Swiss-Prot record:
Chain positions recorded as ATP binding sites: D344, E348, F377, T378, A379, Q380, T381, R382, M383, S384, K395
PANTHER family reported for this sequence: POTASSIUM-TRANSPORTING ATPASE ATP-BINDING SUBUNIT
Subcellular location(s) per record: Cell inner membrane
Name this polypeptide is given: Potassium-transporting ATPase ATP-binding subunit
Lineage of the organism: Bacteria, Pseudomonadati, Pseudomonadota, Gammaproteobacteria, Enterobacterales
Active-site annotation: D307 (4-aspartylphosphate intermediate)
Binding site for Mg(2+): D518, D522
GO MF annotation: an example: ATP hydrolysis activity
Membrane-spanning ranges: 35-55, 62-82, 219-239, 254-274, 588-608, 616-636, 656-676
Protein's gene: kdpB
Native species: Klebsiella pneumoniae subsp. pneumoniae (strain ATCC 700721 / MGH 78578)
Cellular component aspect of the GO annotation: plasma membrane
Family stated for the protein in its record: Belongs to the cation transport ATPase (P-type) (TC 3.A.3) family. Type IA subfamily.
């Protein structure tokens, strides 16, 4: 991965965010955040009062009112700055993607074949269904499917990965992305989208903050904050007539300051930034989420469906042993296995040749000198091999070799059946070798479980997340690998229909399911899953069915996606806890100061020993503004994540952010009060 990572407080982003924070003072922007809109109205009201007092139109301290007004404006500006910083990071990422888009001409074919006549047209004029020809050095003008040819493609502009990939017609590697470059050969591509709907266009729209919609949890929290704000607004509004009736009317400036300190301005000012930053962190992991809803769902996931190959195991099965049938020498089996693999360029085939060389010093032989014919593997026969004179050597799956042997008049030995079961039980894949109608024995192919994966699954289990391994292996092999890897369950001999049924079963139990996929056959299950991470190297159908795309095409990334989702939810919950606890502490500063003249008994609540009512109120307002600034890095970066159970996580957050939220204001407000007093400002 070579994509450049932005510093948390990039100087250029900070400068732009400061300008954007001022622009966001517009009431057309402020009303979208009801909590901060109340602060904005209070700032405007106190500003007008300060001007009126300075001009003699109203009685009261113009200096005190102006000071409160200035810090209320700072409160709004700091909240705007937090949101602008988060949006700025997303826009910077989007701008880097926009740089990939290039104005180009396309060779539009008049017929869907390589040698058809071409028309040179601007790429933006292409429509869904059009067929284009691209050759070495060309920029692919549209998203589409390869219908003819094969080529090496540089996708670094999209993925950040410098290694080229192969794209060819047929199979799961036929999908191409507009904006990538052909390095060699040629492709005939059928466009699958219209201009403005390409994967690159969708990526840009996804990461730009302006396109972000609030998630369900964010909406629910916003409603709670609005409800609290309305309660405190009504409570504050009723104080003025009561205090006026008692003969000691509380000033409007004090009431505005009281209201701002009572309502949850800290989380209200940071809520939008947390959501935008969550999507930005997901992009930092090279995963594109279609919406904040997808990121949020990742944090709530409690079932992970994980492909065995590449996710749980290394995915490159290696020959580990030769197990001869009764009456067959191991060297004879190794010689036949090596001969059948001489032209097999798969990792498994090469490992068989190497193992035979290591065990019996059997050197590679040249097929031409042997006058041999290689028989390639096909999905229909499920075996491969070699024909040398009268010898017919085959290797393949148990069922395929059984049919082959019986078709040639032989029989499948019972002792080999037992060996097959034993190999599968140990978590290896049995590959049977036969010569003519005679079964020679088994090659055991071992797929290595990734180091540390068992510990990661144990952490997920602590968090209440169930892990399910998906594999095409038989049940015995699947059970052995599942036990070695430490997953909670497995689905063996998996088919697309079985995956879909399993997802629906878990969802019917009220669980949220996450999975990865890359093929067209994965599309139904991806569309059904709550969090569906499609591989960028996969088919167009898979990418359209998923709600996230992993640009690195790494199936293990699903675990990281869940961690990022949980971190976003934890950040929102932690800062909400801190904000509400903050408000409780601020009551002890501002309520005695505001009402001591009306109700002298409240003086006993001045536990901080603040200098005067004016210094107490101003200190609380200043602290209320500054705490937003101090929490901006936490909102952008996210709270530190630890894989704990829900109850342990709740206890930890209550101690850190609940108790911290209570104590920090006492220290902060007292320190500000001392500074104001020593400087003679109050």
């Amino acid at each position: 991965m070579s994509r450049k990572q932005l510093a948390l407080l990039e100087p250029t982003l900070v400068r732009q965010a400061l300008l954007d924070a001022v622009k966001k003072l517009s009431p057309m922007v402020q009303w979208r955040n009801p909590v901060m809109f109340i602060v904005w109205v209070g700032s405007l009201l106190t500003t007008l009062l300060a001007i009126a007092m300075a001009g003699g139109a109203l009685t009261g301290s113009a200096t005190f009112t102006a000071a409160v007004s200035i810090w209320l404006w700072f409160t709004v500006l700091f909240a705007n700055f937090a949101e602008a910083m988060a949006e700025g990071r997303s826009k910077a990422q989007a701008n880097s993607l926009k740089g990939v888009k290039k104005t180009a001409f396309a060779r539009k074919l008049r017929a869907p074949q390589h040698d058809a006549p071409v028309d040179h047209v601007p790429a933006e004029d292409l429509r869904k269904g059009d067929v284009v020809l691209v050759e070495a050095g060309d920029i692919i003008p549209c998203d589409g499917e390869v219908i003819e040819g094969g080529a090496s493609v540089d996708e670094s502009a999209i993925t950040g990965e410098s290694a080229p990939v192969i794209r060819e017609s047929g199979g799961d590697f036929a999908s191409v992305t507009g904006g990538t470059r052909i390095l060699s050969d040629w492709l005939v591509i059928r466009c699958s989208v219209n201009p403005g709907e390409t994967f690159l266009d969708r990526m840009i729209a996804m990461v730009e903050g302006a396109q972000r919609r609030k998630t369900p949890n964010e909406i629910a929290l916003t409603i709670l904050l609005i409800a609290l704000t309305l309660v405190f607004l009504l409570a504050t509004a009723t104080i003025w007539p009561f205090s006026a009736w008692s003969g000691n009317a509380v000033s409007v400036t004090v009431l505005v300051a009281l209201l701002v300190c009572l309502i949850p301005t800290t989380i209200g000012g940071l809520l939008s930034a947390i959501g935008v930053a969550g999507m930005s962190r997901m992009l930092g992991a090279n995963v594109i989420a279609t919406s904040g809803r997808a990121v949020e769902a990742a944090g709530d996931v409690d079932v992970l469906l994980l492909d065995k190959t590449g996710t749980i195991t290394l995915g490159n099965r290696q020959a580990s042993a030769f197990l001869p049938a009764r009456g067959v020498e191991e060297r004879t089996l190794a010689d036949a296995a090596q001969l059948s693999s001489l032209a097999d360029e798969t990792p498994e085939g090469r490992s068989i040749v190497v193992l035979a060389k290591q065990r019996f010093n059997l050197r590679e032989r040249d097929l031409q000198s042997l006058h041999a014919t290689f028989v390639p593997f096909t999905a229909q026969t499920r075996m491969s091999g070699i024909n040398i004179d009268q010898r017919m050597i085959r290797k393949g799956s148990v069922d395929a070799i059984r049919r082959h042997v019986e078709a040639n008049g032989g029989h499948f030995p019972a002792d080999v059946d037992k060996q097959v079961e034993e190999v599968a039980r140990q978590g290896a894949t049995p590959l049977v070798v036969a010569e003519g109608e005679k079964v020679l024995g088994i090659i055991a192919l071992k797929d290595i479980v990734k180091g540390g994966i068992k510990e990661r699954f144990a952490q997920l289990r602590k968090m209440g997340i169930k892990t399910v391994m998906i594999t095409g292996d038989n049940r015995l092999t699947a059970a052995a690998i599942a036990a070695e890897a430490g997953v909670d369950d497995f689905l063996a001999e998996a088919t697309p229909e079985a995956k879909l049924a399993l997802i629906r079963q878990y969802q019917s139990e009220g669980r949220l399911v996450a999975m990865t996929g890359d093929g067209t056959n994965d599309a139904p299950a991806l569309a059904q899953a709550d969090v569906a991470v499609a591989m960028n190297s996969g088919t167009q159908a898979a990418k359209e069915a998923g709600n996230m795309v992993d640009l690195d095409s790494n199936p293990t990334k699903l675990i990281e996606v869940v961690h990022i989702g949980k971190q976003m939810l934890m950040t929102r919950g932690s800062l909400t806890t801190f904000s509400i606890a903050n408000d409780v502490a601020k009551y002890f500063a501002i309520i005695p100061a505001a009402f001591a003249a009306v109700y002298p008994q409240l003086a006993m609540l001045n536990v901080m020993g603040l200098h005067s009512p004016s210094s107490a109120i101003l200190s609380a307002v200043i602290f209320n503004a500054l705490i937003i600034v101090f929490l901006i890095p936490l909102a952008l970066k996210g709270v530190s994540y630890r894989p704990l159970s829900a109850s342990a996580m709740l206890r930890r957050n209550l101690w850190i952010y609940g108790l911290g939220g209570l104590l920090v204001p006492f220290i902060g407000i007292k320190a500000i009060d001392l500074l104001l007093t020593l400087s003679g400002l109050v």
